[in-house]
């Protein structure tokens, strides 16, 4: 597509993660018209493959201003247009210590006045502007980088492969077919029989159903991307923090016998039997005059409303009492909920509260790791992976907004059809619907919107 932002500069960025300060290898990526020449200025090599496209060769980085060698590296080169960005691209593979990679980066910039540091997402932005990827692929790359679990990464990669665009194009082509029919009739009305509003309505209804399915699947897909939110709820000292540590296999929460230890929510992302979970430990609910603890309890009740699934813990030693009943009464009926009786080890095995409930109770001794399998089986049954079997793409808020705008355009054809108004009025709504679908893949964009989208990417991508 025609460039609507400046792509003339040669840009560079550290493309690998070095946040821990060390690593075996770090990669500096350079793209643009001066990418190869700028790297030639700081690289000494004797390789016979030097600077050939799609070759990797050995060399040394030299700071010519200080006349010092900086690092021993490997260099990979991709000539335009056969690169990620569609421009000349050079990648410098240097040693991964943060000091070394920053010095190599500084050397590249200081020895070349035609190279600048890339903005966030600028490499992907250039790939999009140069027609190497569509906008949904670019956004899927960002989702893949930020995936919190394996299933989310798999779905994001489907977007990278172009699966989102394929689904949008199917809907768009259906609308283009309807628009072509209308506009042909407008231009050559005498060559056609009367317009069949019923057939048109049926076609539009089928298209709307496809859009609604995409939107509905994305709601479920959001649970994969973010993790099904499971809130651990209960009074103080019933084992919520211990359960979080047990399921996450890490000491994420402080566990004491002092009531009210957890003042704020602790979140852990994990996967249980291929199901992505966001487990949230909340402040124990009790009457207290402690100001900060009360804030935590307020957040607990907010989490009850926001979560997908609630595990309510109580102490088998104390029994299920009116306080527990009162708390559970505040949980919306539509919420998935499992009752967990903890401290099984402290009671007579013949006397338990299992008969108190018709179903959905799990008895555990979290301290002794008894009953974990029963709880996991319950979670899998409630949130089973079958819920996600048909989810193969994930749409972000921008894409969903464009889909809803398209759906509104199609809904606005209903009164035109119902009143059999001049059929050329339908073309306005159908054409606007096509434009909204085109915005999803990037054919209809403003510079400000484009910059906003890519500003959310990491630097170097």
UniProtKB/Swiss-Prot annotation:
Keywords per UniProt: Cytoplasm, GTP-binding, Hydrolase, Magnesium, Metal-binding, Nucleotide-binding, Potassium, tRNA processing
Domain TrmE-type G, first and last residues per copy: 227-384
Cross-referenced Pfam families: MMR_HSR1, MnmE_helical, TrmE_N
SUPFAM superfamilies: P-loop containing nucleoside triphosphate hydrolases
Cofactor list: K(+)
Major localization class: cytoplasm
Name of the protein in its database record: tRNA modification GTPase MnmE
Taxon lineage: Bacteria, Bacillati, Cyanobacteriota, Cyanophyceae, Synechococcales
């Amino acid at each position: 597509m025609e460039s609507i932002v400046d792509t003339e500069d040669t840009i560079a960025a550290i493309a690998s993660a070095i946040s821990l300060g060390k690593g075996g290898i770090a990669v500096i990526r350079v793209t643009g018209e001066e990418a190869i020449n700028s790297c030639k200025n700081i690289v000494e090599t004797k390789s016979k493959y030097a600077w050939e496209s799609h070759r990797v060769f050995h060399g040394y980085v030299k700071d010519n201003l200080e006349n010092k060698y900086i690092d021993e590296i490997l260099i990979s080169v991709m000539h335009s247009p056969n690169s990620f960005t569609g421009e000349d691209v050079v990648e410098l593979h240097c040693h991964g210590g943060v000091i070394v990679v920053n010095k190599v980066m500084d050397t590249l910039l200081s020895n070349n006045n035609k190279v600048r540091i890339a903005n966030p997402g600028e490499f992907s932005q250039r790939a999009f502007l140069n027609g190497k990827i569509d906008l949904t692929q670019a956004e899927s790359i960002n989702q893949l980088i930020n995936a919190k679990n394996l299933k989310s990464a798999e779905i994001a990669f489907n977007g990278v492969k172009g699966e989102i665009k394929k689904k949008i194009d199917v809907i768009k082509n259906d609308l283009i077919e309807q628009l072509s029919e209308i506009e042909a009739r407008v231009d050559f009305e005498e060559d056609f029989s009367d317009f069949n509003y019923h057939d048109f309505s049926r076609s539009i209804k089928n298209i709307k159903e496809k859009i609604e399915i995409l939107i509905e699947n994305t709601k479920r897909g959001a649970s994969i991307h973010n993790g099904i939110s499971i809130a651990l709820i209960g009074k103080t000292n019933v084992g919520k923090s211990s359960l979080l540590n047990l399921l996450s296999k890490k000491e994420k929460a402080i566990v004491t016998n002092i009531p009210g230890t957890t003042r704020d929510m602790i979140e852990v992302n994990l996967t249980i039997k291929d199901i992505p979970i966001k487990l949230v430990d909340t402040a124990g609910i009790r009457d207290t005059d402690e100001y900060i603890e009360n804030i935590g309890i307020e957040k607990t009740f907010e989490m009850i409303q926001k979560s997908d699934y609630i595990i309510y813990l109580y102490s088998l030693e104390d029994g299920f009492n009116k306080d527990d009943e009162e708390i559970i009464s505040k949980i919306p009926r539509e919420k998935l909920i499992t009752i967990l009786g903890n401290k099984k080890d402290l009671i007579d095995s013949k006397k338990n509260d299992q008969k108190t409930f018709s179903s959905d109770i799990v008895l555990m001794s979290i301290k002794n790791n008894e009953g974990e399998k029963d709880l996991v089986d319950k979670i899998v049954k409630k949130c089973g992976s079958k819920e996600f079997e048909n989810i193969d793409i994930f749409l972000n808020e921008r894409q969903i907004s464009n889909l809803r705008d398209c759906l509104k355009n199609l809904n606005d054809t209903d009164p035109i059809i119902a009143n059999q108004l001049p059929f050329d009025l339908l073309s306005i709504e159908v054409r606007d619907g096509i434009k909204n679908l085109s915005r999803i893949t990037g054919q209809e964009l403003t510079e400000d919107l484009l910059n906003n989208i890519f500003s959310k990417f990491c630097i170097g991508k």
